[in-house]
């Protein structure tokens, strides 16, 4: 505006005669209609002048931020879209055509602005960012072009960017300064896009060896970090893609002792894949996949220098089958128990039986293993087997097991401390499972075997049982009570969650899902997820979709605890999907 005033003043000083006022008015009106620094069009024009480009990009970013603020962050607001429409193509062309000529600060600021537009017309620039990085990987944190390109494509999901983004991903090293600030954005974008064309290349990524660092050798540590990023992301994306061709690579990760840090993600991917993954695990359990078993043995020897003992691949196969949770896995697991001699493997198989919709045969098999184990028996990767199986007994959500559990407590062996700890744990499992008519048995067990801690928990459980009796919907409401979200009162909510699973039905499950936002305590959210799983034994795409809506909503929340608390919901969601195929 200052420039316009100066020019207008100069014109007036040159005007002569009585016609001056009228002529000046006409010319001034014309000048006001011209572009000036207060208008985005002025700066769009300046993009063509190399010496002005840096300042022009900064000013256009300011225009965009101001427009977005005035529109209350509404990207669809007319004033925001008007600015984008005026600038998106010139900015895109500048990045695409002048990439090599721009200084780093201007170039990165430009791609950030284009990414903020979330506009499909920026595709040539986003593609350029990915391709240039893949061609010549950068390491400086100042060269963060692909950070912004990844954020944009996370929402845009453009088919034409699938391969360029994949190639950039394959070149990104988290061990670099740039990798440290970009890896999360690239991971989230890869997961969001999950292009079907990636199944082959990402399965290949999982074939790369990983050697956990055992020294301070920076090169070895950096290589491990890079592989961890690539392979964890690859496993997660392969699960989302859902292509059965990924099952062999994911299963191979599960038996590779060098990839322990990738295995949790690979396991969830196998759960998503459902039946094809369960079929592969069954083959491994039966010892029929000799190539995979030989690979496992060679990796154990390579990393430890010793031959593996007791066929640990059996435990891995059982873990996969139990986590997937398909009822058709039960015959193979029960059959494996009949021939298995190793206590550790037997304990793992029994634990995994408790994760699958129960049958009389599976409950009997679980009890048989429990009764056969000595107090000193351990379960891989470590810990007392009976301790874990006592907790697992509760996963059946079967009050009919209470008399049997109390018999195990009475017959418990071992040294005094171990025996007392096991008996207290059994009493607590009994308390969780007890229906109103069984609370007297639970109280007797708690008084006999429990400490003051267990006795205090009994009081919480008793209160909620007295309130709700046999009414499943009452327990749903109790699970959602704000008082029970407090850690000191959470056992009342845990008891309520067990009773929802024991007394409820599909209607109860739907009521629970509808009120999950009220369940903020992580332990209660876990119990709620288990109740949903228990009440959906045949799986359900509809229920899975409802859980996914909750997970996606919380993932966008500024409260990171909300997203973290949804881990059990995710696993149940995948299990419900895996049971339907």
Predicted regions and their residues:
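Structural detector for internal amphipathic alpha-helices that build alpha-solenoid repeat scaffolds
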Residues: 53-81, 100-120, 139-158, 176-196, ...
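Low-complexity, intrinsically disordered short segments enriched for Gly/Pro and polybasic residues
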Residues: 18-21, 25-26, 474, 495, ...
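Extended amphipathic alpha-helical repeat scaffolds
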Residues: 11, 32-36, 47-49, 575-579
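Sec-dependent bacterial lipoprotein signal peptides
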Residues: 2-32
């Amino acid at each position: 505006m200052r420039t316009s005033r100066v020019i207008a003043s100069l014109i007036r000083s040159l005007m002569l005669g009585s016609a001056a006022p009228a002529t000046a008015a006409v010319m001034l009106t014309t000048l006001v209609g011209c572009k000036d620094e207060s208008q985005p069009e002025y700066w769009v024009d300046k993009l063509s002048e190399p010496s002005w480009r840096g300042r022009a990009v900064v000013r256009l970013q300011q225009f965009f931020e101001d427009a977005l603020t005035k529109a209350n962050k509404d990207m669809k607001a007319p004033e925001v879209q008007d600015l984008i429409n005026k600038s998106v193509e010139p900015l895109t062309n500048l990045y695409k055509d002048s990439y090599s000529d721009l200084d780093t600060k201007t170039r990165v600021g430009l791609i950030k602005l284009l990414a903020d537009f979330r506009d499909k017309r920026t595709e040539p620039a986003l593609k350029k960012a990915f391709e240039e990085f893949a061609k010549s990987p950068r390491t400086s944190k100042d060269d963060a072009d692909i950070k912004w390109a990844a954020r944009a494509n996370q929402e845009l999901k453009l088919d034409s960017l699938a391969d360029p983004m994949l190639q950039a991903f394959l070149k990104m090293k988290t061990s670099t300064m740039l990798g440290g600030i970009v890896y999360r954005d690239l991971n989230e974008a890869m997961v969001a896009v999950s292009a079907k064309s990636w199944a082959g290349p990402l399965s290949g990524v999982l074939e790369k060896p990983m050697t956990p660092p055992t020294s301070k050798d920076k090169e070895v540590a950096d290589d491990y970090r890079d592989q961890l990023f690539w392979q964890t992301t690859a496993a997660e994306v392969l699960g989302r893609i859902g292509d059965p061709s990924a099952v062999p690579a994911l299963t191979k990760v599960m038996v590779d002792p060098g990839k322990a840090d990738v295995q949790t993600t690979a396991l969830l991917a196998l759960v998503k894949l459902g039946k094809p993954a369960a079929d592969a695990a069954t083959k491994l359990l039966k010892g029929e996949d000799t190539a995979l078993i030989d690979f496992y043995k060679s990796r154990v020897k390579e990393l430890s220098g010793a031959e593996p003992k007791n066929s640990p691949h059996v435990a891995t196969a059982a873990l996969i089958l139990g986590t997937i949770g398909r009822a058709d896995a039960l015959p193979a697991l029960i059959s494996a128990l009949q021939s298995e001699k190793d206590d550790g493997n037997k304990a793992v198989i029994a634990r995994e039986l408790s994760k699958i919709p129960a049958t009389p045969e599976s409950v009997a098999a679980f009890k048989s293993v429990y009764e056969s184990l000595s107090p000193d028996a351990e379960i891989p990767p470590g810990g007392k087997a009976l301790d874990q199986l006592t907790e697992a007994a509760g996963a059946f959500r079967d009050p009919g097991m209470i008399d049997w559990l109390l018999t195990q407590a009475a017959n418990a062996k071992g040294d005094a401390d171990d025996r007392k700890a096991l008996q207290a744990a059994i009493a607590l499992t009994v308390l969780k499972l007890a229906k109103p008519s069984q609370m007297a048995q639970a109280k007797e067990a708690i008084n006999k075997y429990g400490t003051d801690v267990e006795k205090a928990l009994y009081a919480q459980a008793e209160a909620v049982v007295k309130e709700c009796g046999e009414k499943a919907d009452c327990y749903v409401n109790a699970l959602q009570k704000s008082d029970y979200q407090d850690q000191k009162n959470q056992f009342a909510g845990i008891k309520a969650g067990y009773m929802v699973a024991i007394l409820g039905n599909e209607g109860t499950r739907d009521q629970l899902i509808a009120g999950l936002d009220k369940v903020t305590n992580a332990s209660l959210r876990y119990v709620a997820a288990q109740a949903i799983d228990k009440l959906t034994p045949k799986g359900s795409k509809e229920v899975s979709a409802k859980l996914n809506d909750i997970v996606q909503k919380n993932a966008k929340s500024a409260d990171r605890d909300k997203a973290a608390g949804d881990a059990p919901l995710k696993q149940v969601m995948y299990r419900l999907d895996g049971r339907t195929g």
